Amino acid sequence: MLAPLLLVSALNLGAAPDPLAGPRAEAQALVLIQQTLQWYTATVGETSIQAETYLGHDRLFSKETIARFRKAAKEKGISADERRAREYFQAYLAGEYLSQSTAKYDDKAQNAALQATVRLPWMKDPVPYKQLDLIVADEKDAGRRAEIEKARSEIQKTALNPILAEKEATAQRLARELGYRSYVELSEESRRAQLRPFMVEGKRFLDATDAMFKELVAEVSQRELGIPAAQLRRSDFNRLFKAPRHERFFPADIAVPSFKAFLGGMGIDFKTVAGTEVRVDDAVNPLKEPRAACWGIRVPSDVRVNVKPLPGLDSLGVFFHEGGHAVMFANTTTKVWEFQQLGPGALTEGLGETFRYAWADPVWLRRYRSFVQAHNAEAKRNDPLMSDQDIRELSRLQILYQLYYLRRYAYAKLVYESVLHGGSPSLWKGIYDRPTSDPMALYRDVFSTAYAVPMDESDALRFRTDVDDTFYSLDYARSFALAHLMSEGMRAKFGADWYGSPEAGKLIRTIVAEGNKTEAEDVAKLFGVPFDLRPAEARLRRLVAE
């Protein structure tokens, strides 16, 4: 066995080793391990040991390695793809450096949240803080929902916000230590997008949709909750979007078969381009995470989705979103790891939202009704079928949901987080011209505008917990814009019922083939339109008018 080894060594003597290969291989192995562990934590309740996975990787996430890749991304003579891959990798390193350095604050906040309980007068025992989202969405009484939020705010005020204030200051300092002018600059580099232009567009969208949004709020809140618009509060939106009147149309075990039917109409199966099946864990395990999630363990061959079957459209919508991630991972053909796993999230989140947004479209809702009818016959079930009036009402509820989140992210989140993260006032000049020195007051003002409901102090105390690290909020805002753009583009190319077009499925596979190398602007060019919120506005107005 010695001779072949000596021959290999001799052949490699003249080849200079790639100084970037080692960190890349180390990161690939680390991400593989982390995602596999996350899968078992989510599906069977294994104790999370993510922190331990970073042990021994200090050099990988050091300032020196980050600086090396930052310099390498500017190197002359490399291909455009290699440059972009290096940029993605450098942004990954910088983000992980911040995450590790601020992990102690996340751990403190997480532990404080896990240990915290609140007293609700109508409940015998203290209620865990972590269960309040579920409780407020299930609570039928508006007064009690407000009390739940007030109790939650006390935990935020006393236990969580002081910790998160320290985290914010530390993150801003660390960004400057890495050579960035600010935390905002680091975040824009990570998202590969500029905040200012999208904030301008977000404000335009907010103003343009204000009358439509308020009319829908008045109509839908009265019908779904029996609450006049003047009495609606932020604490009511969780219950509103849970759509309790329509829950009977979406039994807990319908998620996987209905999603496969959704894909099947477009000629997409739930298999990978490597020939393997997308692995779906839909077991009812009491220890599993209740929210659906997706992992591209090895792209494209090992793609996994976790879902804990729950009734209702809110749960089903989340599964469709995660199914969008799975379809992207499963149909990615690029061999470049950075394009498989790293980079901005706008495309993968956008595909997920495109699938979720189908639930506002009466065309898909009628297809779903036909699916349930066939499913009943095949499985000898008797699940109720939506009437045409049910479809109309559910569509309008979903239109409101989509408007709400676009106004929240494209306007309120971006303005607020630009200020919170120490951005230059030039970012929000002309978009928000009121005082910004008090973050809690600012939060209360911009979110009250976005939601079109008054916000009290208990609502405003969310100003530390309602924050996305490194402006993932920008990825979300861009993904919402992309989802509407893709939905309108598909409709223009393949007709109103593009859900039944195999050509639409082919186009989706083409869009995702290069993974995250394809950015939102690239998709907009494919459909021949600028990347902005005008397709979203047009689609929502069209659906309201139908």
Label for each model-derived stretch:
Residues 2, 6-11:
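Hydrophobic helical h-region of N-terminal Sec-dependent signal peptides
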